[in-house]
């Protein structure tokens, strides 16, 4: 990160940060995409099982990665204030925090997942695949969270290209392990859909090993003296949790509502479950665009706010939101035109493809809503405003999606589509609430700046 003097320099810096994050996010979401697509080609029953498993996994995993992502604004503020010597200490505290959170998530997966999956009305075969998938996936919890901390460090330092290069390794690693374990190639035991969970875990262990080597060999990081182990500092841990818990909670509130919808849909046939999850899976892949802008906004805004250059932060906000709209125009057009081709990536059954196309059409609307809402979350994180957005997210997602879904399900014959309508309206409401909060925060900082003149 560095100080910029004009709009052109800001645009160049923003795009330099944004594009590597975008490629990184695509690679990150590709793990779930590869698991779902390759399992769908195996058979529909296993796809339904993996779909149910990811509905449980995603909220808790994103909650914990959201907590450790608090490292980005913390380091951003240090750099903006010229306190680079504080970076290593915060990095190690988040490593310790990630290890503790890994143990919590591991226990939840091993003990709670089977109870939930066996009591929501799933067919026995589908539930069995889901449980085995989660058990295999739990092997990779530690490297998943530790890599998230390393990535947050690199991103906050502006080394987003390095994060991108590391994450690009995930797709070939995950695809290779999945091919061996799902289909039983080259004498490896055929595990079906559950093998996708083990494939993802193995891929992340390899990725973590490579990341640690890079961390200590990268010339630009040697000035941080990361080789010096820093002991546990509970005050810094508490600061990280204080800032990270609302971030994780906000992400959890959004992701969990999608997952709850997926679990409620257990009452439908395996075909509908598989079609719903396939459409949702590809929509998650497309979410990489607004999510990347959100991450980039958190980096640049936190840096400028830390340096007390509030007008520069405001300029970046405008750049980020326009970038989101431009990319949305391209991605939504692409999905609308090629939604039939997208559906065929997940299976060959004509009924399955037709149903998935319908779900993908609904997904266009909540992807548009995400274009407005997601960048606002990153901007608010850049201002270190996380608590109020958490409650706004709870209100917007949970206070709207479920009641609207229930209303449409009871009064219309929309069936499974009622769930998607509820999600779309909840995203629109959440985006409006985040925009209101940003207006309040920006006025507060502008008043603070004027009072010090």
From Swiss-Prot:
GO cellular component terms? plasma membrane
Assigned keywords, A-Z: Antiport, Cell membrane, Ion transport, Membrane, Transmembrane, Transmembrane helix, Transport
InterPro entries noted in UniProt: MATE_fam, MATE_MdtK, MdtK-like
What is the recorded membrane topology of this protein? Multi-pass membrane protein
Keyword Transmembrane annotated: yes
- Give a Pfam family name: MatE
Q: Which GO terms describe its molecular function?
A: antiporter activity; xenobiotic transmembrane transporter activity
Record field: transmembrane: 12-34, 54-76, 96-118, 128-150, 162-184, 194-216, 243-265, 285-307, 319-338, 358-380, 387-404, 414-436
Listed under GO biological process in this entry are: monoatomic ion transport
What does the UniProt entry say about where the protein is found?
A: Cell membrane
Main role? Multidrug efflux pump.
Q: Which family does the record claim for this protein?
A: Belongs to the multi antimicrobial extrusion (MATE) (TC 2.A.66.1) family.
- Name this polypeptide is given: Probable multidrug resistance protein NorM
Provide the species name: Streptococcus pneumoniae serotype 4 (strain ATCC BAA-334 / TIGR4)
